[in-house]
């Protein structure tokens, strides 16, 4: 069994813009059109059985909506397991703990943070309570 542990897909309506932004920000050529269907097509072509989708919230106000979509995707298909996202500027410790409880309840197995796209260092003090809550 082959598992691709680092993939990205976006809702169909957001995929074109997301792919453009990600390509420009990373300086890399991206493959496919950024949709779930495109990801599964590449998986089938390459003999990949399972994949993990790693969403990134570039703004704190995106965290909850992205995470709800990831839970929905996990409930309606089984080829790609979606992780959640978190942002260092998420509103409060209480909100963060509530969000983590929601994610655990719905079977989310990991959370993606991205220092480069979210403008922080891994040892940033804003993340201490997040790391502790995840432990």
Describe the residue ranges of each PLM region.
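Active-site gating/metal-coordination segments in enzymes
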Residues: 50, 58-135
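An N-terminally biased module of ancient metal coordination in phosphate/nucleic-acid-related enzymes
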Residues: 1-53, 60-61
């Amino acid at each position: 069994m082959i598992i691709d542990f680092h993939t990205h897909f976006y809702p169909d309506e957001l995929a074109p813009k997301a792919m453009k932004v990600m390509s420009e920000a990373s300086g890399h050529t991206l493959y496919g059109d950024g949709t779930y269907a495109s990801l599964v097509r590449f998986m089938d072509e390459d003999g990949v059985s399972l994949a993990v989708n790693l969403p990134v919230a570039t703004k704190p106000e995106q965290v909850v909506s992205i995470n709800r979509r990831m839970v929905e995707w996990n409930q309606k298909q089984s080829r790609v397991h979606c992780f959640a996202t978190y942002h260092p500027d998420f509103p409060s410790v209480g909100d963060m703990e509530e969000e983590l409880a929601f994610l655990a309840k719905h079977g989310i197995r990991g959370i993606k943070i991205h220092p480069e796209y979210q403008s922080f260092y891994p040892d940033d003090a804003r993340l201490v309570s997040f790391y502790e809550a995840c432990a």
